[in-house]
């Protein structure tokens, strides 16, 4: 949520892994832009502890993420209801105004409805900011925000690395997705976008397979998963024969 105009973006994940924190933050930056500061709770995926002078000791992967994307983080002060409330008020607002009395088919449907709800909320008048959040954001906030850089480092956060099992599957969000047997690498990168899951080579130069995200716990096989590579035949006539 933008502290100045109240524009909001929410996204749900099936677990609270740090890689999903990074994916959700990148999607929020794509939606609203990158601010100078991000206010966050004192989560272990963000900060380990504070030193003797009270300065935060960042979790190393989060610190690298900050440097890559280009923003600084401010932490909620312990036992300080004003800053703590700034983070938790949105959670309460979402629970009471979005999640209440709704039925969702799966996480994909949940996020589609969440995005529609955010667009609707950002486009109506809110008394707290005395205006329409989207209009205030475009007029006053956008000039202070940066666009998300289109770099291999950022794409790497959107496509986490996964090890390929001996039977040709990668595990992502509690389910297994097939990788073509012809791929020689031991790892692959995985990205879920909407209702489709994409599997790329480790260098992200090749798309290996796509899967429909059904949220079923059954293994998802890709087309021709166990087919061997096609045999190459000579183009010129064969003149030499071997007799056994």
Task: Show which residues each predicted segment covers.
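Acidic/histidine-rich, metal-coordinating catalytic segments
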Residues: 34-54
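Active-site-proximal acidic segments at structured loop/helix or strand boundaries
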Residues: 91-191
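Two-metal-ion acidic nuclease core segments, chiefly of the RNase H-like superfamily
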Residues: 55-73
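Protein C-terminal end segments and domain termini
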Residues: 194-244
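The substrate-binding groove and active-site-proximal loops of carbohydrate-active enzymes
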Residues: 8-15, 48-53
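RNase H-like two-metal-ion nuclease catalytic core shared by retroviral integrases
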Residues: 40-41, 52-53, 73-95, 110
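Active-site beta-loop-alpha junctions of metal-dependent nucleic acid enzymes
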Residues: 10-37, 214-221
């Amino acid at each position: 949520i933008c502290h100045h105009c109240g524009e909001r973006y929410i996204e749900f994940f099936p677990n609270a892994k740090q890689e999903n924190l990074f994916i959700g933050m990148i999607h929020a930056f794509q939606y609203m832009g990158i601010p100078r500061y991000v206010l966050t709770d004192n989560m272990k995926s963000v900060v380990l502890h504070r030193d003797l002078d009270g300065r935060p000791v960042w979790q190393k992967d989060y610190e690298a993420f900050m440097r890559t994307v280009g923003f600084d983080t401010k932490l909620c002060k312990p036992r300080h209801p004003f800053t703590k409330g700034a983070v938790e008020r949105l959670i309460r607002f979402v629970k009471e105004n979005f999640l209440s009395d709704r039925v969702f088919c799966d996480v994909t449907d949940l996020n589609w409805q969440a995005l529609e709800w955010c667009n609707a909320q950002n486009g109506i008048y809110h008394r707290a900011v005395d205006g329409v959040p989207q209009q205030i954001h475009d007029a006053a906030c956008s000039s202070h925000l940066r666009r998300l850089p289109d770099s291999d480092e950022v794409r790497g956060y959107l496509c986490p690395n996964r090890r390929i099992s001996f039977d040709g599957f990668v595990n992502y969000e509690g389910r297994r997705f097939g990788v073509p047997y012809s791929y020689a690498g031991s790892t692959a990168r995985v990205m879920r976008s909407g209702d489709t899951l994409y599997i790329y080579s480790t260098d992200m130069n090749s798309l290996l397979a796509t899967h429909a995200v059904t949220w079923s716990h059954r293994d998802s096989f890709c087309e021709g998963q166990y087919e061997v590579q096609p045999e190459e035949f000579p183009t010129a006539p064969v003149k030499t024969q071997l007799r056994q």
